[in-house]
Amino acid sequence: MNIHEYQAKSLLKKYGVAVPRGGVAYTLEEARAVAKELGGPVWVVKSQIHAGGRGAGRFKDDPNGKGGVRVVKSIDDVVASTDAMLGKVLVTKQTGPEGKEVKRIYVEEGADIKRELYLSMLLDRATSRITIVASTEGGMEIEEVAHTSPEKIVKVAIDPVQGLQGYHARKVAFALGLEGKQVGACTKFLLGMYKAFTDLDMSLVEVNPLVVTGSGEVLALDAKVNFDDNALYRHHEIEELRDESEEEASETEATRHGLNYVKLDGNIGCMVNGAGLAMATMDIIKLYGGEPANFLDVGGGATKERVTTAFKLILSDPHVEGILVNIFGGIMRCDVIADGVVAAAREVSLHVPLVVRLEGTNVDLGKKILAESGLPILSADNLADAAEKIVKAVKEAA
């Protein structure tokens, strides 16, 4: 689960992480009030959407204008910048060409920036540990730094038994070239960041840039936080921060029904049980010249109703021109899948090619249900056969 920058900063601040003062605004009047309270003389007006690259982004109605993060020097300019952002669609590298509508603004006090650094904590699969990633190249995408200047990145893996210690934090501070009281400030910053990460079951916290001010303060000028969805049941206060308007409506609906769904840009819908099999299914669709329209894992204990819901989710995408159902019945029974597919196809008046590959528990019964349904369903014997058939059927129907 993702949250907005202002929400991330509010959470981190509770753990002693230093952030600039600021306030969220939904209207021009609220933006003016926040700016007056902060006092100036410099303010930063930031669009709040679930995507990075806001500063370099452009608004659809003003592609040659300024981006979604603006530094201003008067309260009137705060209001004018807010007016130029609210209700407008911001396009960044991460939003895709469709962009995201800006529905709230974060007005923040300006900072006397002397250095920009990068700092994050994440779960490192290679070490199975929480790992600090830091770099002197702040303000840039860390992937770009890793590609062009990998020597400028330092990583520190944290032993889960020991936890983050002061010497870990000082090692990072020294690697970033911090001196004097900056080292102590960075140490406090990191210890608070780690406590927030572990207490709130985060999967990522990224501060880019982490800045050193003229007075030696170490501040989070931006903050991005992701949470482990599987741990949200322990954090109802975090769930309340969810902004469903920033998420795909179909993905939100899928979550409500216990489905794992991610919308993609292709035209062949996929319904599979198991994340690994789902990824393999998408790969083989591409191998045969098609493009998957989604990732959809119905799980191992799906009911007929859940399968029907999954089918409707796929068909809710207007770009879907064909569907491939690929089920290996271990825990899942093939006859349950078949019942769900038939029920959904009848309910939505199926109008696109459908290929079903079943294998495993009750496979013969499942195939019988499909064959006797009277629906134009193509049966496949294996995964390659299924992918080849759906790609061919979609091309012929075009």
UniProtKB/Swiss-Prot annotation:
It catalyses: succinate + ATP + CoA = succinyl-CoA + ADP + phosphate; GTP + succinate + CoA = succinyl-CoA + GDP + phosphate. The keyword Metal-binding applies. Keywords: ATP-binding, Ligase, Magnesium, Metal-binding, Nucleotide-binding, Tricarboxylic acid cycle. Binds 1 Mg(2+) ion per subunit. The keyword Ligase applies. GO terms for biological process: succinyl-CoA metabolic process; tricarboxylic acid cycle. Mg(2+) binds at residues 208, 222. GO terms for cellular component: cytosol; succinate-CoA ligase complex. Its EC number is 6.2.1.5. Pfam families: ATP-grasp_2, Ligase_CoA. ATP binds at residues 46, 53-55, 108, 111, 116. Its cofactor is Mg(2+). It comes from the Bacteria. One of its GO terms (molecular function) is ATP binding. Substrate binds at residues 273, 330-332. Residues 9-253 form the ATP-grasp domain. Pathway: Carbohydrate metabolism; tricarboxylic acid cycle; succinate from succinyl-CoA (ligase route): step 1/1. NCBIfam families: PRK00696.1, sucCoAbeta. Succinyl-CoA synthetase functions in the citric acid cycle (TCA), coupling the hydrolysis of succinyl-CoA to the synthesis of either ATP or GTP and thus represents the only step of substrate-level phosphorylation in the TCA. The beta subunit provides nucleotide specificity of the enzyme and binds the substrate succinate, while the binding sites for coenzyme A and phosphate are found in the alpha subunit. Heterotetramer of two alpha and two beta subunits. Belongs to the succinate/malate CoA ligase beta subunit family. PANTHER family: SUCCINATE--COA LIGASE [GDP-FORMING] SUBUNIT BETA, MITOCHONDRIAL, SUCCINYL-COA SYNTHETASE BETA CHAIN. This is Succinate--CoA ligase [ADP-forming] subunit beta. It comes from Rhodospirillum centenum (strain ATCC 51521 / SW). The gene is sucC.
